[in-house]
C-alpha cells in the first residue's frame, strides 16, 4: 500500500490523501483475477478475457502514469533537474475542481513542471499543451515560478508544440533503466 498526497501537501497535516495498492501486479490481481476467480476455475477464460479487455487500457494507463511520474527525475526536461513528481487534485483558484497527472518542482524551487499522461493510440499534444496552460492559470502554487509543460503519451499525433516536452514509452523506459 502507498499513501498518495497531492503536490505541495504536508505529509503530517494533510487530510487530502488516497491509499493505493503500490504494486502494479497486485493491482492487476485485485482488479481482474480475484473478482473472476470462480469463472476462471470453471474454465471460462475467454469470457473473463472479453470482460477485462473493456477496462484494460484504463488499468495500463494508471501504471503508465506511475512510470511517467517516476521518470521525471531522470528525463532531460528543459535541462532542469526535477524532484520526484506527484499528482495534484483539488480546487483551483476559481474554486473549480482540477487534476494534473504530473507536477514536480525543480531542485532549486524556482521552476514547476506540469504534465499530462495519456495511454491512447492518438494523442494530440497541441491540445493537451493548451489545456495544461489553461489549468496553470488556476493553480494555487505556481505564482512567482517559471512553468514548464510536458506530455507523456503512448502515441503522438501531429507535431510537438514549442514550449512542451513530449515523451513516449521508449523515453520513459530508457530513463528508468538507470
PLM regions and their residue ranges:
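Short hydrophobic beta-strand motif reused across regulatory alpha/beta modules
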Residues: 1-2
Amino acid at each position: 500500500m502507498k499513501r498518495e498526497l497531492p503536490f505541495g501537501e504536508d505529509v503530517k497535516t494533510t487530510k487530502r490523501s488516497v491509499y493505493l495498492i503500490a504494486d502494479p501486479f497486485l493491482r492487476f490481481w485485485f482488479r481482474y483475477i480475484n473478482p473472476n476467480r470462480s469463472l476462471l476455475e470453471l474454465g471460462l477464460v475467454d469470457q473473463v478475457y472479453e470482460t477485462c479487455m473493456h477496462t484494460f487500457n484504463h488499468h495500463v494507463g494508471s501504471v503508465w502514469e506511475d512510470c511517467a511520474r517516476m521518470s521525471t527525475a531522470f528525463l532531460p526536461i528543459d535541462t532542469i533537474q526535477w524532484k520526484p513528481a506527484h499528482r495534484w487534485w483539488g480546487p483551483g483558484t476559481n474554486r473549480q475542481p482540477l487534476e494534473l497527472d504530473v507536477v514536480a518542482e525543480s531542485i532549486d524551487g524556482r521552476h514547476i513542471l506540469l504534465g499530462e499522461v495519456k495511454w491512447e493510440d492518438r494523442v494530440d499534444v497541441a491540445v493537451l499543451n493548451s489545456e495544461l496552460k489553461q489549468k496553470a492559470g488556476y493553480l494555487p502554487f505556481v505564482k512567482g515560478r517559471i512553468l514548464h509543460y510536458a506530455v507523456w503519451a503512448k502515441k503522438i499525433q501531429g507535431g510537438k508544440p514549442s514550449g512542451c516536452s513530449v515523451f513516449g514509452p521508449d523515453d520513459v523506459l530508457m530513463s528508468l533503466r538507470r
